[in-house]
A protein has these predicted regions:
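Short, well-structured N-terminal submotif of metal-dependent ribonuclease cores
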Residues: 1-25
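Hydrophobic/aromatic ligand-binding patch that stacks against planar heteroaromatic rings
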Residues: 15, 53, 83, 104
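Conserved beta-strand segments of alpha/beta enzyme cores
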Residues: 22, 58-60, 111
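Glycine/small-residue-rich phosphate/adenosyl-binding loop
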Residues: 26-28, 33, 38, 47
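Residues at the C-termini of beta-strands that transition into short coil/loop
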Residues: 27, 65, 116
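Active-site neighborhoods of divalent-metal-dependent phosphate/nucleic-acid chemistry enzymes
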Residues: 58-92, 97, 101
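Acidic, PIN/NYN-like endoribonuclease modules and their adjacent C-terminal/linker elements
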Residues: 71, 97-125
Length: 125
């Protein structure tokens, strides 16, 4: 699995492959990954990538037992929030503005950061 070194997300992907951070996913999230990937590549390759992600030691498969429904503008985004809460994740990395509502919710507290902020955290290690 490769991402071009010219791609803005290259460092994020390489850091993932090197085990520099944990990725928490649920079955719903994995299904979305496969769906999004298959828009640009074949369904079989998308499935392979999802399988390869699952094989990494720095992936935590989470089965959220509660749906918080904190994002009303795009309820489909809640799968990421529910997973993050269940995993006790430090933050969600996203560029999706629907997640901004999480900054105003005192409980449960879910941190959100942009990809650029995440890249800064990776570089400061």
């Amino acid at each position: 699995m490769a991402v071009s070194s010219r791609n803005v997300y290259y460092r994020v992907w390489q850091s993932f492959l090197e085990g520099e951070y944990y990725l928490c996913v649920s079955n719903e999230i994995l299904e979305e990954y496969a769906e999004v990937l298959s828009r640009n590549i074949s369904v079989n390759v998308a499935r392979y990538i999802v399988y390869a992600i699952l094989e990494r030691n720095n992936v935590r498969q989470i089965n959220p037992s509660y749906k918080w429904n904190l994002i009303t503008a795009d309820p489909d985004d809640n799968k990421f929030v529910d997973c993050a809460i269940s995993a006790n994740a430090r933050f969600i990395v996203t560029e999706d503005h629907h997640f901004n509502v999480l900054r105003t919710i005192p409980f449960p507290k879910v941190g959100i950061i942009s990809i650029d902020e995440f890249l800064e955290k990776l570089q400061s290690r």
